[in-house]
């Protein structure tokens, strides 16, 4: 659990860096029917541009997907500002790296069909509307990054980097990640991590440095407990939600929204006390 906890916190910090960005005139999701495909395949546009230089794909990346492209270029790849002269060529050059070129091809093969993930996310979002009505539904898309971050959040938009979910035996992973990390780099973790990081961005830690490890762990367990409810299964096992399971047994009338707000308020109390003591 500790390795996963560290990974989740690391991704959260990157998410919060992007949280203040503007996301244009995107329309919030209000409902999802059985035919909806809630995951938008931005990665397919990337592939078209990166493998063929298709100008129409580039135009769509810089219009329909302007926020996603800006987040990719400026915050994930960190290769400059999107509107800079020569940026189109710079993007192409960046992905000419042999490791990334191979990843593009492998992502294309592995994720040719994402029906299972779409269905899993659709179920989560429908449950979120009912169980967390005050939380705006995330706008989820897929992308190809550079093996640095699995999930990025920009306000309501959540980007899933598919190159981080190619399976524990993917050759590149063995060079950079330990065995425990590789076990989590499978497509089964994609939607649970997506929902976890999005909820952490909506119910953040606050003053992270002044919060005890016990409070951090409890808040993460609260998020995982809620994600289990959204998934309709115990993806995060009892060992990872044991404290919250016990807490909810004593507070059976508490809603999921109340649980997350309670945990966040408890951390605020600790942060406030720490700040006062520091004066």
PLM features: what roles do these ranges have?
Residues 17-20:
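C-terminal motif of bacterial Sec signal peptides marking the signal peptidase cleavage site
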Residues 22-92:
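N-terminal mature-domain "stem" immediately C-terminal to a signal peptide or N-terminal signal-anchor/transmembrane
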């Amino acid at each position: 659990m500790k390795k996963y906890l560290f990974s989740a916190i690391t991704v959260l910090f990157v998410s919060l860096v992007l949280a203040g960005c503007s996301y244009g005139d995107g329309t919030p999701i209000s409902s999802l029917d059985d035919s909806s495909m809630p995951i938008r395949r931005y990665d397919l546009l990337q592939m078209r541009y990166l493998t063929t230089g298709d100008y129409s794909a580039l135009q769509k990346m810089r219009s329909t997907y302007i926020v996603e492209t800006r987040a990719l270029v400026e915050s994930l790849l960190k290769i400059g500002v999107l509107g800079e002269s020569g940026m189109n060529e710079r993007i192409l050059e960046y992905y000419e790296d042999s490791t990334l070129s191979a990843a593009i091809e492998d992502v294309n093969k592995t994720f040719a069909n994402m029906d299972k993930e779409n269905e899993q996310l659709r179920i989560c979002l429908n449950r979120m509307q009912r169980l967390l009505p005050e939380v705006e539904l995330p706008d989820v898309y897929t992308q190809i990054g550079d093996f640095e971050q699995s999930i990025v959040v920009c306000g309501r938009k959540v980007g899933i980097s598919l190159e981080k979910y190619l399976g524990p035996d993917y050759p590149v992973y063995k060079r950079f990640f330990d065995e425990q990390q590789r076990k989590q780099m499978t497509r089964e973790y994609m939607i649970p991590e997506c929902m976890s990081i999005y909820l952490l961005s909506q119910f953040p830690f606050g003053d992270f440095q002044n919060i005890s490890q016990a409070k951090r762990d409890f808040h993460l367990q609260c998020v995982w407990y809620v994600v289990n409810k959204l998934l309709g299964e115990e993806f995060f096992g009892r060992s990872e939600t044991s404290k919250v399971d016990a807490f909810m047994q004593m507070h059976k009338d508490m809603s999921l929204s109340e649980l997350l707000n309670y945990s966040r308020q408890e951390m605020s109390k600790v942060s406030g006390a720490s700040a006062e003591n520091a004066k």
